[in-house]
Design a protein with these regions (language model features):
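Short Gly/charged-rich anion-binding patches and loops
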Residues: 3-4, 25
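A generic alpha-helix surface/boundary motif
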Residues: 2-3, 41
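Amphipathic, hydrophobic secondary-structure cores in small proteins
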Residues: 1, 9-10
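Residues within the helices of the helix-turn-helix
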Residues: 5-6, 45
Length: 53
């Protein structure tokens, strides 16, 4: 249901620090759309739409 920072760092082959920035950015977009977000996690469907569409 959610990807964690560690999973995103592994998939994108980036540092954990960069993965946190990506997650924060995606969660900021979700908040603007009215969704409740969880720090350090991003919904799998939303992540896949943004990175693998």
């Amino acid at each position: 249901m959610f990807y964690t920072v560690d999973e995103i760092a592994t998939m994108l082959q980036v540092s954990k620090s960069k993965a946190y920035k990506i997650v924060a950015s995606l969660n900021k977009e979700l908040k603007k759309m009215g969704y409740i977000t969880i720090a350090g996690r991003v919904p799998k469907k939303y992540f896949q739409e943004k990175f693998y569409a």
